[in-house]
Design a protein with these regions (language model features):
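Periplasmic c-type cytochrome electron-transfer domains
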Residues: 1-222
């Protein structure tokens, strides 16, 4: 599916080009500046030549995006939920299983579905109860009034460790995100026990193998 909250990137390759030259993210001046920066690392030049042997300019901005996208596609997130859905009924606690039922009964599953629990559709923010947002969402891309406040539904994989939440980063806690989404999207005023139950389940979607990885030599040369 498309990338970014407003769907302005059609695939991972297009997405990978954005943050690098975005002035409020990585802030590189231009694609040429990216090529020059990476071209200053001898090992990168050799690796790109090996990865793209048919290209006269192996270390190009397009190929940088292709390489990043290829890496991103290797990022899978095995979780205890996956063990449970595959037949290991002890993988989730009774509390987490109740949380799944609450998640479904509250209506969350209508948008956050599939193996990724979202990430494959757009939805209007404030579908039932209006949500105050200065960001027009997909409308900024399409200029179609029907796309006003339409955003990509995010995946809930690793949601417990990827705060802040929402397109504007305005929500700091998972509990508050659950409470607000239930109200604005499906019109449910969840009580504290229901919010806590859903939160317990969502934590079971965290990748058990999340570890910090570090490059050994490249970072010091950048």
């Amino acid at each position: 599916f498309v990338q970014f909250w407003d769907g302005r990137a059609e695939d991972l390759e297009a997405q990978a080009k954005g943050p690098v030259v975005n002035p409020i993210e990585m802030g590189m001046e231009s694609p040429k500046a990216v090529e020059a920066k990476l071209g200053g690392v001898e090992s990168y030049k050799a690796q790109f030549a090996s990865a793209f042997p048919n290209d006269k300019r192996a270390l190009s901005f397009n190929n940088v995006a292709k390489a990043i996208a290829a890496f991103e596609r290797t990022l899978v997130s095995p979780s205890r939920y996956d063990k449970w859905i595959s037949g290991d009924k002890a993988a989730l606690t009774p509390q987490e299983q109740r949380g799944l039922h609450t998640f479904i009964n509250a209506g969350c599953i209508a948008c956050h579905s599939g193996t990724t629990f979202g990430g494959s559709m757009y939805q209007k923010l404030g579908l039932v109860n209006p949500y105050p947002s200065a960001d027009a969402g997909r409308f900024a891309v399409t200029k179609d009034p029907a796309d006003s406040l339409m955003f990509k539904v995010p995946s809930l994989r690793n949601v417990a460790v990827t705060w802040p939440y929402f397109h504007d980063g305005s929500v700091r806690t998972l509990k508050e995100a659950i409470r607000l989404m239930a109200w604005h999207q499906v019109g449910n005023k969840l009580n504290d026990n229901e919010v806590a139950s859903i939160e317990i389940f969502l934590k079971s979607l965290t990748n058990e193998k999340i570890t910090a990885t570090h490059t050994k030599t490249i970072a010091s040369k950048m």
